[in-house]
């Protein structure tokens, strides 16, 4: 029979204080349990078994953000697919940033109905519990004010408790145990020992001033050592009214008997003891707390332009993706597009180099760890084989020898690491690229419009140089023909008087001339 069925068979009128105190005896130095009368057995029967069943949401086995996202979408009643976005924790040692809206207005009427349904469900007489009626509370004049309009159900509360308790019930018998310390910090999270499990606190903040808080201070009895548990304290300025609990009040701990009651919050609510948020208050709790509905800020959208799982990777200020504004200059000036491609190729090489360096370091650490584990396992097996040689030990019997096969792949891993190191050296370069050099000159990487200005300035400089070159070439080409013509005119004069002179000379040599 599973533990849940075992719990189901617990009589409804069984006193909760009877759990796990059989080991206390009178006269041996350990405080004994006082004799319980019938009236005392029914005094706190308001707390049924599932209010004291240990349960907690294990952060390692459930994704609280996904649970919140689903509940958020269900609350919006969005039938179509949509994106649900919410704030993430600031650090890895913090949980979701929960806000708590305290119970107010008509919520107290629903809570009073919850107490009445609980009384009918258990069939118990709450004659010993005091201040259980909301008419006795300071908020009795605000019952007509609006609230969260969320009724509380005993059955829903019970189902949620059992759903949380099933994975944590490892044994069929509940035995309440004590610890030397009821408080500890694990991985940065506050934990409280409630007698069965460690309760892990969640961070919560009041979204407004709480209309009503309950405060329980340290008890004056010292018959039950190591039973107090400090849950947290809401500052006085954040509570409009505070009820100082007495011994037998609702939510209080009866210090006349050894504490053994857990006060679970109704479905949809939790106890806020600033800054800690608890699913229930364990026995012997101390602090100032209030009931409220936790919620987290969120929004929903139908479609998203950029999916949240695509990171905007940055390496030395270089973008790893092409921005949409970079496409415009590449259409009119292909040289800019070519420069962008070169830039992102360099960025890809930088990313690859960094990834290989990280992989090299992590695999090196794992290789060293596996090597030492290999040595320890080999030594342990050898020692175990020596002790259990008569029965064959943990080795394989081959004729008269005992053989153990332990694979050792550290050499292969070392070779792979050496090859990775060579690959890193191939793609590594200490020289600055053209883009980085230009960026260093500008004390930062230029944007797309700065690139256009650089290209235009370059084109203007080249154009000026070409114009100047063409001008000097033209001037030089015009100066050379004029120089040659002057030289030829001085050596061979071809003017008309010269022609007549030559003609008269030819006439002298002709004898037949007139």
Swiss-Prot record:
Pfam family, one: TLV_coat
Annotated motif CXXC, positions: 82-85
Glycan attachment points: 58, 133, 140, 155, 218, 226, 267, 350, 357, 408, 412
Coiled coil: none
Region (Transmembrane protein): 317-514
Tissue-by-tissue expression: Low expression in placenta and testis.
Locus of motif CX6CC: 395-403
Region (Fusion peptide): 328-348
Disulfide bridges in this chain: 395-402
Spans through the membrane: 452-472
Chain positions covered by the region annotation Surface protein: 60-316
GO CC annotations, alphabetized: plasma membrane
Keywords: Cell membrane, Disulfide bond, ERV, Glycoprotein, Membrane, Transmembrane, Transmembrane helix, Transposable element
Cell location: Cell membrane
Span(s) of short sequence motif CKS-17: 378-394
Site feature (Ancestral cleavage site) residues: 316-317
Record PTM text: The CXXC motif is highly conserved across a broad range of retroviral envelope proteins. It is thought to participate in the formation of a labile disulfide bond possibly with the CX6CC motif present in the transmembrane domain.
UniProt-listed PANTHER family: ENDOGENOUS RETROVIRUS GROUP PABLB MEMBER 1 ENV POLYPROTEIN (PTHR10424:SF8), VIRAL ENVELOPE PROTEIN (PTHR10424)
Protein family per UniProt: Belongs to the gamma type-C retroviral envelope protein family. HERV class-I R(b) env subfamily.
Function comment: Retroviral envelope proteins mediate receptor recognition and membrane fusion during early infection. Endogenous envelope proteins may have kept, lost or modified their original function during evolution. This endogenous envelope protein has lost its original fusogenic properties.
Record text about domains: Contains the CKS-17 immunosuppressive domain present in many retroviral envelope proteins. As a synthetic peptide, it inhibits immune function in vitro and in vivo.
Protein known as: Endogenous retrovirus group PABLB member 1 Env polyprotein
Organism listed in the record: Homo sapiens (Human)
Gene name linked to the record: ERVPABLB-1
